[in-house]
């Protein structure tokens, strides 16, 4: 049975690339969520004025992988204690967030944060909010990391996260 989950963990290139390599994930799509502008562009989102977060919509087979496991992956590929930035990417569009589609996802997200908080010195600032309209990002953003491995940002930031996730989640890597 196909379900959806939406996560924001900084630049969507790495988040999308990791989820697309997980068994049970049918598709991960980079996009924008929970802003005030309809059909925002990347350029508009980068100004920070639209209110959107760079996010990834994950379509997954719940008989193969659970939402809880997706939460584990999400929290392992970004720093949930950084408010409105991930590393050198700064702005509200790079915030950490879980955008739930039903009450169960909200409860599981809040439970996971409560479980993880004792393992962090800083407060987890991941927002847990109802999903508003998800707008897919422009085509050139889809699959960006794997299509542009020589990009300097990818080499310095995204690829190391991707490779770390590949090792950590080897048993469920495609």
Swiss-Prot record:
GO molecular function: L-methionine:thioredoxin-disulfide S-oxidoreductase activity; peptide-methionine (S)-S-oxide reductase activity
Catalyzed reaction equations: L-methionyl-[protein] + [thioredoxin]-disulfide + H2O = L-methionyl-(S)-S-oxide-[protein] + [thioredoxin]-dithiol; [thioredoxin]-disulfide + L-methionine + H2O = L-methionine (S)-S-oxide + [thioredoxin]-dithiol
InterPro entries, sorted: Met_Sox_Rdtase_MsrA_dom, Met_Sox_Rdtase_MsrA_sf
EC number in record: 1.8.4.11
SUPFAM superfamilies reported in the protein's UniProt record: Peptide methionine sulfoxide reductase
Keyword list, A-Z: Oxidoreductase
Coiled coil: none
Active-site residues per Swiss-Prot or TrEMBL entry: 11
Pfam families, A to Z: PMSR
Recorded superkingdom: Bacteria
GO BP annotations listed: protein modification process
Family statement drawn from the similarity comment of this UniProt entry: Belongs to the MsrA Met sulfoxide reductase family.
PANTHER family per the UniProt record, alphabetical: PEPTIDE METHIONINE SULFOXIDE REDUCTASE, PEPTIDE METHIONINE SULFOXIDE REDUCTASE MSRA 2
Function description: Has an important function as a repair enzyme for proteins that have been inactivated by oxidation. Catalyzes the reversible oxidation-reduction of methionine sulfoxide in proteins to methionine.
Alphabetized NCBIfam families for the sequence: msrA
HAMAP family the record matches: MsrA
Protein name according to UniProt: Peptide methionine sulfoxide reductase MsrA
Organism field: Pasteurella multocida (strain Pm70)
């Amino acid at each position: 049975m196909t379900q959806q989950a939406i996560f924001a963990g900084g630049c969507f290139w790495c988040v999308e690339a990791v989820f697309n390599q997980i068994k049970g994930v049918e598709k991960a799509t980079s996009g924008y969520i929970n802003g005030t502008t309809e059909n925002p562009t990347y350029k508009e989102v980068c100004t920070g004025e639209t209110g959107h977060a760079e996010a990834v919509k994950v379509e997954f087979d719940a008989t193969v992988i659970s939402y809880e496991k997706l939460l584990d992956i999400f929290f392992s590929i970004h720093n949930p204690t950084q408010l409105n930035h991930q590393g050198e990417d700064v702005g509200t569009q790079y915030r950490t967030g879980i955008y739930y589609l039903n009450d169960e996802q909200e409860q599981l997200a809040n439970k996971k944060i409560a479980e993880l908080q004792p393992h962090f010195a800083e407060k987890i600032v991941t927002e847990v909010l109802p999903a508003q309209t998800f707008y897919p990002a422009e085509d050139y953003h889809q699959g960006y990391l794997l299509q542009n491995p020589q990009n300097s940002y990818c080499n310095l930031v995204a690829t190391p996260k991707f490779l770390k996730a590949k090792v950590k989640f080897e048993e469920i890597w495609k």
